């Protein structure tokens, strides 16, 4: 379509309508030193090969998961992704961000979503799951909103050991919503449950396990305390930890959420990933997002539909349970493929991660980097260092990436199944040399 600019008369009319004198006033919130005061100097167009060459050169200076060694934690991890995962999600039948608006035409997509939901239920021990959310943080926030819809209470308890980004997203959701967020302090790296005193009018308690530091929380005690007060328990979990830890169902979680990146999704510079969301059948009509259901057609054949569509696109906005629309379904599909391939091996995988992270933590302590707190952990752990940022930068210069930095003297280290003994021993050698 040919570009037709606005006429001077149209621009004048629009500026008058919004009470401005000139176009520059539209951008008054941008610092003047950041504004370009000349015409763009753009070269002529490139052909395809020139464009490819440009991006090859640009990409060559950026380390990827195969050219560096990652011990990065804090929410995104360098896990193994089977080749079949990328192959299957790239099929043209699946490769789209959308579930079609006439969704029942795409029976393969809906069946895959149904299978994904079934796998999440099996993993968490819960009765029903939705078709995924944007990420783990939005899943936590939607769980809090759901809890308030269920019991009508407007106070939310959140552990300080929950990932700070999750807490920040929850505070963003709080804008325009009438509810109060209270935080439970941490003590020695885990939630101080002795502070659970005034639980009146508390809608739910949000805890993460393993928590932001990688430490394991007392989820049984937390569940008992909040349920005695008449609130709901929201558990944010690492799905791979469930191969070796109790399922959330076993300690009485009402809603189970989490970040799904570790289930067959690459790090991808932080996203896109997806959030999983599972709960009890009693709460199915309060659940956000879309959900695939199995039924039969008029001829008795098994078919799949989007069921209980309580999104704002389908019913009156004030009656909707969420405004989740184009979710990260393609990434959830990757997790369904991953779980189908790896599901039976999750206990072995979890034990491998546990053994390797324990080995590294013990060895680092022996060369002067002890645990920040003595707690049980899974996959990641915080260590003490004289200058955490300096250690992080020096290791990066050698192609080894650790972090994030928690404070001046503490940084996280994560160990996945991709980290070999050779990787870990080299990291130990490098860090010993920095003492």
Curated annotation (Swiss-Prot):
Q: One MF term from GO for this chain?
A: glycine dehydrogenase (decarboxylating) activity
Catalyzed reaction equations: N(6)-[(R)-lipoyl]-L-lysyl-[glycine-cleavage complex H protein] + glycine + H(+) = N(6)-[(R)-S(8)-aminomethyldihydrolipoyl]-L-lysyl-[glycine-cleavage complex H protein] + CO2
UniProt EC number: 1.4.4.2
Key word Transport present:
no
Q: What class of enzyme is it?
A: oxidoreductase
Superkingdom is Bacteria
What cystine linkages occur within this chain?
none
Protein keywords:
Oxidoreductase
- Gene3D superfamilies, from UniProt? Aspartate Aminotransferase, domain 1, Type I PLP-dependent aspartate aminotransferase-like (Major domain)
Query: A single GO BP annotation from the record?
Result: nucleoside metabolic process
Q: What does this protein do?
A: The glycine cleavage system catalyzes the degradation of glycine. The P protein binds the alpha-amino group of glycine through its pyridoxal phosphate cofactor; CO(2) is released and the remaining methylamine moiety is then transferred to the lipoamide cofactor of the H protein.
Q: Output the NCBIfam families linked to this UniProt entry.
A: PRK00451.1 (NF001696)
Q: How does it assemble?
A: The glycine cleavage system is composed of four proteins: P, T, L and H. In this organism, the P 'protein' is a heterodimer of two subunits.
Q: What HAMAP family would the database entry show? A: GcvPA (MF_00712)
Entry's family note: Belongs to the GcvP family. N-terminal subunit subfamily.
Q: What is this protein called?
A: Probable glycine dehydrogenase (decarboxylating) subunit 1
Organism from which the protein derives:
Coprothermobacter proteolyticus (strain ATCC 35245 / DSM 5265 / OCM 4 / BT)
């Amino acid at each position: 379509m040919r570009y037709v600019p606005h006429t001077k008369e149209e621009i004048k009319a629009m500026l008058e309508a919004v009470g401005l004198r000139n176009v520059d006033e539209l951008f008054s919130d941008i610092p003047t030193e950041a504004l370009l005061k000349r015409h763009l100097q753009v070269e002529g167009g490139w052909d395809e090969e020139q464009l490819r060459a440009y991006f090859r050169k640009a990409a060559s200076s950026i380390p990827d998961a195969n050219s560096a060694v990652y011990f990065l934690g804090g929410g995104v991890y360098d896990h193994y992704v089977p080749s079949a995962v990328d192959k299957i999600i790239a099929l043209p039948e699946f490769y789209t961000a959308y579930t079609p608006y006439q969704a029942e035409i795409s029976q393969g997509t809906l069946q895959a979503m149904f299978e994904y939901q079934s796998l999440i239920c099996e993993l968490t021990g819960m009765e029903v799951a939705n078709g995924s959310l944007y990420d783990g943080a939005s899943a936590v926030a939607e769980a809090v909103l759901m809890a308030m819809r269920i019991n009508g209470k407007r106070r939310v308890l959140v552990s300080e050991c929950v990932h700070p980004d999750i807490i920040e997203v929850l505070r963003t959701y709080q804008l325009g919503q009438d509810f109060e967020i209270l935080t439970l302090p941490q003590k020695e790296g885990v939630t101080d449950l002795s502070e659970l005193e005034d639980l009146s009018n508390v809608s739910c308690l949000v805890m993460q396990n393993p928590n932001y530091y990688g430490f394991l929380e007392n989820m049984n005690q937390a569940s008992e305390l909040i349920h005695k007060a008449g609130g709901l328990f929201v558990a944010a979990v690492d799905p791979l930890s469930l191969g070796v830890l109790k399922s959330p169902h076993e300690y009485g979680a009402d809603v189970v959420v989490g970040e799904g990146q570790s289930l067959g999704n690459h790090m991808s510079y932080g996203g896109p990933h997806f959030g999983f969301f599972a709960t009890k059948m009693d709460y199915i009509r309060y659940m956000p997002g879309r959900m695939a259901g199995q039924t039969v057609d008029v001829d008795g054949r098994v078919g799949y539909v989007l069921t209980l569509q309580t999104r704002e696109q389908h019913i009156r906005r004030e009656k909707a349970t969420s405004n989740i629309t184009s979710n990260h379904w393609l990434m959830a599909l990757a997790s369904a493929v991953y779980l189908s391939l790896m599901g039976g091996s999750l206990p072995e995988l979890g034990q491998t991660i546990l053994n390797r992270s324990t080995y590294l933590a013990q060895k680092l302590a022996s060369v002067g980097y002890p645990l920040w707190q003595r707690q049980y952990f899974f996959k990641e752990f915080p260590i003490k260092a004289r200058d955490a940022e300096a250690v992080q930068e020096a290791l990066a210069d050698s192609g080894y990436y650790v972090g994030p930095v928690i404070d001046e003297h503490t940084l996280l280290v994560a160990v996945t199944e991709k980290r070999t003994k050779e990787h870990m021993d080299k990291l130990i050698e490098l860090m010993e040399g920095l003492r």
